[in-house]
Swiss-Prot record:
Protein name: Voltage-gated potassium channel regulatory subunit KCNG2
Entries under SUPFAM superfamilies matching the protein: POZ domain, Voltage-gated potassium channels
Subunit note: Heterodimer with KCNB1.
Reported function: Regulatory alpha-subunit of the voltage-gated potassium (Kv) channel which, when coassembled with KCNB1, can modulate the kinetics and conductance-voltage relationship. Modulates channel activity by shifting the threshold and the half-maximal activation to more negative values. Potassium channel subunit that does not form functional channels by itself.
Domain of life: Eukaryota
Intramembrane region ranges (chain numbering): 370-381, 382-389
GO molecular function: potassium channel regulator activity; voltage-gated potassium channel activity
Amino acid sequence: MARLPGHPEVPGAEPGSAVRGGRGGRGARARHVIINVGGCRVRLAWAALARCPLARLERLRACRGHDELLRVCDDYDVSRDEFFFDRSPCAFRAIVALLRAGKLRLLRGPCALAFRDELAYWGIDEARLERCCLRRLRRREEEAAEARATPPARGPQTSPGRALGSGRLERGRRRLRDVVENPHSGLAGKLFAYVSVAFVAVTAVGLCLSTMPDVRAEEERGECSTKCRNLFVLETVCVAWFSFEFLLRSLQAESKCAFLRTPLAIIDILAILPFYVSLLAGLAAGPTGSKMLERAGLVLRLLRALRVLYVMRLARHSLGLRSLGLTVRRCAREFGLLLLFLCVAMALFAPLVHLAERELGAHRDFSSVPASYWWAVISMTTVGYGDMVPRSLPGQVVALSSILSGILLMAFPVTSIFHTFSRSYSELKEQQQRAASPEPVLREDSTRDDSTRSASATEDSSQDPETAGAAGSLPGPVGP
């Protein structure tokens, strides 16, 4: 790097005289400064900085020596009298607009968080942003904080240290992970996903058929017809496949405890376990244990009703369902606000309609305030079953107010929930596309190959004068 020309520090000298020395008129250099930010050269007047001071440039003006100057900027060109800053030129254009027009706006190009860091670097308060731009920055900060708080989704990729494993067990686990977790990895992954979805559909059909009146009548009489036996065989085959799939997913997981704590693994356990519990209970009771089965019949039926959770397994293969689950996790605060709004409105309109109908109108539909809570919830959600209808004029006025307030209260958090769903869907779709794109396999000898190729390329370029001349003509940073 070119050094500054020597300027002895004179007591009482003007601040920045060591920086503004050199060829040319001293008065012109005292009035202007040339700033180069990432290739964007701007000539600024010190008077503009006085109107809207930048902390870093003010420190630059007060510099008196070379070492002090390098603590403020990244480089200094003596021939051009130019100060170089290795920062974002896009963000600096917005700062130049602030100096010239007095308005600071958030540009569409750079990231809002990166722009905030640039403002902190140049010493500009975020409050100088225009109101609309400041709202955009705050919203982006909330999204970033929310993304940091949300645990990352487990994908099919492994850590780099695991990916470099050369053992046969690690390679087999990697292939198994691609098959069961990444349907886009190949033909085996697609077939596994299709078979899993098909078994979920068959289980849903079998669950519907098992609730038919004739099948229920046979179960209550203790009989087992051909239809009942076929449904049992169908359920057994499906549960066997789901158990096999659960075993494969647990084998490919790096941490078994972390895998068992995932929501989909908990759903699998709750859906599979009732079948084995009822089967073991039937085998333990034997042919003479009918009374014990009768006492445990209600519990077993409730456990077998958990088979409906098999439908939630579709979330493994549906991008929309996974986006919905991520949205529910991220919008817990919005759902809490919605519940709070409904509870407050319900506590307000239920006593009013009870007073209007029971006390003033003498109608018996609204027998108590707790019974009126049901009517308030149904009315505010615009469902309207019609089982409880206000018939007096005051009651109808209360009903109209309840319906209108319900429409407004439901609409408040919906916009935020919709935007969160759109963002979650875009993130998961991008993650799925990255997982589907082929990645190069890392090998142990890749480092040696790269170093060999780099050495050969260096030798070739040193022997070829044209290549060396072209390389020497490339611009580079100013060095000391």
